[in-house]
Every structure is written in structure tokens, then in C-alpha cells.
Amino acid sequence: SLVGSEMCIRDRLYIEDIVDEFCDDYIVPCVQANAVYENKYLLGTSMARPGIAKKLVEIARKEGATAICHGATGKGNDQIRFELSIKALAPDLKIIAPWRDSNWKLQSRQDEIDFCTAHGIHLPFSVDSSYSRDRNLWHISHEGLELEDPSLEPNYEHLLVLTTPPEKAPDEGEYVTMTFEKGVPVSVNGKKMKVSDIIRELNTLGGKHGIGIIAVSYTHLRAHETK
């Protein structure tokens, strides 16, 4: 996230599709290891960061770069996930973290929204629905707004993206048959698919029936609590 830089010089832009690698090398091993946080959170954000860091290092080596810059804030766990992964793979590379720079002008989500508005950058959400979201094939997490107040109920009508509020889900259930080989799913309802497509199929089926909603408070490594 380089929004807010006085000047952003772009030489090359890489858009890499690592979905299948994410599924095979991260999601499947984590599921097989029963890697769950607080008995219900399936680590959708946590498990994605090492793969991103790995690709960043590969591209940095390809380009002959001497540093990697990330847009994680100075409060959350992502800065730790990215930097430990990068340092494990490429200890010689310098890490640049603008959010921890005292001269960085954007210190909150509202600052970013104001910056975009002032510079004519369209945002696909309104200020009153500006949840902080992290989405990948495995999950979507939401933070911010009423979620930060334990006394308030989540506004599922505005919040949910991948699933349906339970009260709006069908009354009738739906049967799903899955086949596994060596602990890895290979088909859904008799249709053979690769893991990434199986996850997409199950997201659609589960979302239709209001499956997959959890609420969890977790502790940042820097002792911040987030709901």
C-alpha cells in the first residue's frame, strides 16, 4: 500500500497468480495439522502471508532489488508475518515499512479515505461501511466500525460478503459428498476438481446456507486487542 507517497515511481508491475500454490502448500497442510486459533479461526490471513513474502523475495531477486517495502501497519500482526518470512528467505534484503516511519502522513484508515477523496480516487465503499477486510480464496475477515465495540451486534446486512445471514438462508438443507485421496479433497458431489476449485465450490454452497460466520477477539503481538 503506497497510497500517500509524495511520488510513486513504478518501473514494473507484477500480478502473480499463486492461488494453487496457496492451496497446495499452505491451506492443505494447515487443515491437515488442525491449525486453528481460539478453537474456530482457520488462520486465513496468517497462512497467506508467508506465500506472499516468498513471491516478493523471488521478484526482488529477479529484479536485483536490495529492499522490499510492505504496507502493513505498525499495529497489527502482518508486519511480523511479512518480515519474519522475508528475513528467513533473504536476510540480506532491507525491509521498508512506511507505516512505522514518523514522517508517514497517513496514520489511520480515515486518513487514507480522506487522501483518496482529496485526490479524486474512487473508493468502492462509503465511509460508514468502510470495514477493514482481508480476503483470499480461503476466507474473508472484517474489522472496524461496530465490530470494535463488544456491546454492539455485527451488522450482517452490511458486513457479510461470502455468506448469507442465517435468517435469510434456505430452510431446507443440502447434502454434499466429498472424496479424499491421502487426506486431500479431490471431488465434490462426484465431480473431480483441483483443490482451489473445490474451495470455491464449497464457499458457494456454504455461503448459500449461512455457514462460516465466526466472531473472535485476538491479541496482536504488540498487545492490541481486535474483535
Predicted regions and their residues:
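ATP-dependent adenylation/pyrophosphate-handling site
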Residues: 1-6, 14-17, 99, 202
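Conserved small/polar residues in nucleotide/adenosyl-binding loops
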Residues: 2-11, 219-226
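A conserved beta-strand->alpha-helix junction
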Residues: 10-33, 127-133
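Conserved beta-strand segments of alpha/beta enzyme cores
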Residues: 11-14, 94, 122
